[in-house]
Regions:
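Order/disorder boundary and secretion-linked terminal/linker segments
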Residues: 397-492, 523-561
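Glycan-processing catalytic domains of CAZymes
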Residues: 19-411, 484, 511-514, 522, ...
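Sec-dependent signal peptide recognition
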Residues: 2-8
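Short, surface-exposed tryptophan/glycine-enriched loops
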Residues: 498-513
Length: 561
């Protein structure tokens, strides 16, 4: 099947058959490993015009050295007392190791230039409904090597009709000497000649840049951008945007008094270790000394730290932040800024290597430490898996609302269009000890999948970029989740193998064609394990991960709007 844009495909389908319905974000469902379900249109309410969600996105993996990886969580698993042992062989030489990892991402210790990873990130953002990526350039680097790979991928999906996130640079706060060179660089690289202008995040009619406006910029730069000042804590001036939510969440306002944005964060910044504590490593950091209370890490809620096993999987602190943002008194705020997707790294500062901070302990870990004291949403290997991603999906849905899902009447077809390109092989270096990451499991790539019901049977069809291969047990698998049935370990009640089209009698599923019903489904090709997380990594899946497509059938009334 030749590649078509989302819009052209849907137009062709509609012109050929007036009973064909394009799916939308409301036709996604699923649940995380904790049993928390993706909220539906009935729970979110209708679309809230003008509301958007931004996500802090990091470009720095491998850009400051590829030594390692040195994973603090794995070091502590090997020796629980390693934080108090500066001479432990588990520690690298801080003079030659600028960065440590707090944990392992699902896609491995990747470099930000890995396009295989970038495509998966973009797919996840499309499915979540993210509107803008804020690039963390607060340390004086803008990482052009990475954005030169990211922007063409975003543009490709945009040109095919997918709603991709826009981009915005978030520069250094005032105290870090936010100068003009970084702004000039991104101006010359991407803005001056209107390169990737489809992807600019617009605010007040101009591309937004978060940096200090009172610098000696060129007049053409001052005229081109809408400026907002950066800070990490509650702003004291108007036209200042922040991401930290400390010491308490608040709403940033413009100079005209208009409420503009609010922050939502996984945990407070500076969840770091600086000195021995009774709970070794669990929350002594700058924030404790500044705000005179325990660090509010992932498991903090109702004024205390939840110490139950796996408490860090639930995103308790994040949920409190989300609930605050969603309160009725903040319905007029148009933008929520979520911190964050993928920091993963922490500068390795010790008494030997540090020249920035007055240290109270031999090691200083600023902002990240381990699974509990970190703030990334991107799925990880083990640990919280993809729970924070699906929590983010739910927040976006509640913040922005949802359209009515596509509903099929008798004989109608619902089409679900897939973002292709993610089945290309992976062949890219990771951190030094990882060598080259490879993945050649992509075989049958889904272009779109369709479902119809004539009142007696369901017809599922998968169209692939190339003619499908159906030679393996894991080839062209269809998974169904039918209400009232007990799902298996993967989360499904029925499996079908090795075909691109399945006609399934409703009676086989216990469904009645005279009644309205809903079911969830997923297509998968060449998975490597019976693990829901494998749907993110190997082969192709429509949709990826724990998300499923939602098919809604109503014999009395299809969605013909």
């Amino acid at each position: 099947m030749r590649k078509m844009s989302v819009l052209s495909l849907v137009a062709a389908l509609l012109s050929a058959d007036a009973a064909t319905r394009p799916a939308n974000l409301a036709n996604l469902a699923g649940e995380d490993h904790l049993g928390r379900k993706i909220v539906s249109r009935a729970e979110t309410g209708p679309v809230k015009p003008g509301r958007q969600v931004g996500l802090f996105y990091y470009l720095w993996m491998g850009q400051h050295g590829t030594q390692g990886p040195y994973d603090i969580s794995k070091m502590e698993a090997a020796d629980p007392d390693v934080m108090d042992k500066p001479d432990s062989p588990l520690w690298p030489d801080s003079a030659h190791t600028p960065m440590l990892h707090w944990g392992e991402p699902l896609f491995g210790y990747y470099l930000s230039t890995d396009e295989w990873v970038i495509r998966r990130h973009v797919e996840m953002f499309i499915a979540a409904g993210i509107d803008v990526l804020y690039f963390d350039t607060t340390n004086g680097y803008h990482y052009r090597e990475v954005t030169d790979r990211l922007f063409p991928i975003l543009q490709e999906y945009h040109d095919r009709g997918f709603k991709v996130p826009k981009f915005c640079y978030y520069m250094a706060p005032n105290r870090r000497g936010s100068g003009t060179s970084n702004v000039l660089d991104v101006w010359l690289n991407y803005y001056k000649d209107r390169k990737f202008s489809d992807l600019y995040f617009m605010w007040d009619g101009k591309p937004l840049i978060v940096t200090h406006p009172d610098r000696p910029y060129r007049q053409e730069i001052l005229d081109f951008f809408t400026f907002r000042r950066p800070t990490w804590c509650t702003p004291s001036k108007p036209d200042t945007w922040y991401w930290g939510g400390m010491p308490t969440q608040n709403v940033a306002v413009a100079s005209n008094g208009r409420r503009e944005m609010l922050p939502v964060t996984v945990s407070t910044p500076h969840a770091a270790m600086e000195s021995p504590t009774p709970q070794r490593g669990r929350g002594i950091g700058a924030s404790e000394f500044r705000w005179r209370k325990d660090v509010q890490s992932r498991s903090w809620h109702h004024g205390r730290l939840d110490t139950r096993e796996n408490a860090s999987h639930y995103g308790f602190f994040l949920q409190e932040q989300m609930d605050w943002a969603l309160a009725p008194e903040r319905e007029d705020v148009p933008l929520a800024f979520v911190c964050q997707w993928n920091e993963w790294l922490v500068p390795f500062l010790t008494e030997k290597s540090n020249d920035l901070y007055k240290m109270r302990h031999w090691i200083h870990l600023m902002d990240e430490y381990n699974m509990e004291s970190s703030r990334d949403i991107e799925p990880m290997k083990g640990g919280f898996q993809d729970a924070y991603y699906l929590q983010l999906v739910n927040f976006v849905r509640r913040w922005k609302g949802l359209p009515d899902p596509a509903v099929a009447g008798k004989g109608d077809t619902v089409v679900f269009v897939e973002p292709t390109g993610d089945c290309a092989p992976r062949n890219h270096p990771g951190y030094d000890a990882c060598g080259v990451y490879t993945n050649f499991t992509g075989r049958n790539e889904f272009a779109d999948v369709c479902v119809s019901c004539d009142g007696t049977k369901l017809v599922f069809t998968a169209n692939t970029v190339k003619p499908p291969l159906c030679d393996r047990e894991t080839s062209m698998n269809l998974f169904l989740r039918v209400p009232g049935k007990e799902p298996d370990a993967l989360g499904y009640t029925h499996r079908y193998r090795r075909a691109a089209r399945y006609e399934i009698p409703l009676a086989d599923l216990g469904l009645d064609g005279a009644q309205r019903f809903e079911l969830q489904f997923k297509w998968s090709d060449n998975r490597q394990a019976d693990d829901p997380m494998d749907f993110y990594v190997n082969g192709d899946a429509a949709p990826r991960g724990r998300l499923n497509y939602l098919f809604v059938y109503d014999p009395q009334q299809g969605n013909r709007s």
